UniProtKB/Swiss-Prot annotation:
Protein family according to the UniProt entry: Belongs to the Mediator complex subunit 11 family.
Pfam families, per the entry: Med11 (PF10280)
Biased segments, Basic and acidic residues type: 136-152, 168-186
Name of this chain's protein: Mediator of RNA polymerase II transcription subunit 11
Length: 236
């Protein structure tokens, strides 16, 4: 298949690219001329500006030509001498009927460029895919069984944990009760209980009692004195 049409398009785009590069070069020289202190700055500035505008016009014209050529050859293959069709990006290849023959020819050429694949290689690839799928299924089954085992183990261990927790709670509550009794004892110790003591002191006597005691004492003294007098009389 001839590729002159495609090559022409590539050459045209390359020329446009070169013109854009030269345009940028001329713009840089224009700024250098403007910043220099030569006497003929005005003439050189004008000539370089004219060259820049001419390059811009050529680039615009060439781009418009390429856009026109691509627009004319989109979806058809009889607009150029090589019969090349330009496909847009959004074209559905399954539903279009334009350029089907050319498309099939290009696919055959691509298949010819690829190395041939033997049947043994195809079988090896299919066997490897099958083994990989079997391994994936085994791993999935193992994961499911592991999840089931964990669920059963959790269902068994949960009652044991609940029993342990209840036993721990009862153990924790019993020391609390004992401590409460001890606290009561500590709050009211036996030594600090106010027990009324038996009074060992003699009962207090009033003022009248004191007078009676003094009178009794005087009587006793008088008796003693009389006894002493009697003894002296006996002795004499």
């Amino acid at each position: 298949m001839s590729e002159t049409f495609i090559q022409e398009r590539l050459d045209s785009l390359y020329e446009i690219d070169c013109k854009i590069v030269s345009l940028l070069d001329n713009i840089s020289t224009l700024f250098q001329t403007y910043s220099s202190s030569d006497g003929d700055v005005k003439e050189s500035f004008a000539s370089q500006t004219e060259e820049i505008y001419s390059i811009l016009s050529k680039v615009a014209i060439d781009l418009r030509k390429e856009v026109k050529v691509m627009d004319d050859n989109i979806g058809v293959y009889d607009k150029n001498k090589d019969g090349v069709m330009i496909l847009p990006i959004g074209v559905d290849q399954k539903n279009t009927t334009l350029g089907r023959k050319k498309l099939n020819e290009e696919l055959k050429e691509l298949e010819g460029l690829l190395p041939p694949v033997s049947k043994s290689n195809e079988e090896d690839i299919s066997m490897a895919d099958a083994e990989q799928s079997v391994e994936i299924e085994k791993n999935a089954e193992e994961d499911k069984t592991q999840v089931k085992k964990e669920a059963v183990q959790e269902s068994i261990t949960e009652p044991e944990k609940s029993n342990q927790s209840t036993n721990e709670e009862t153990k924790e509550t019993q020391p609390d009760q004992i401590e409460s009794k001890d606290d009561i004892k500590q709050e009211t110790p036996f030594n600090e209980i106010n027990i009324p003591k038996e009074s060992t002191s003699e009962p207090e006597l009033g003022l009248g009692a004191d007078i009676d005691i003094d009178m009794d004492n005087n009587d006793n003294n008088n008796d003693d004195n009389s006894n002493v007098d009697d003894l002296f009389e006996d002795i004499l």
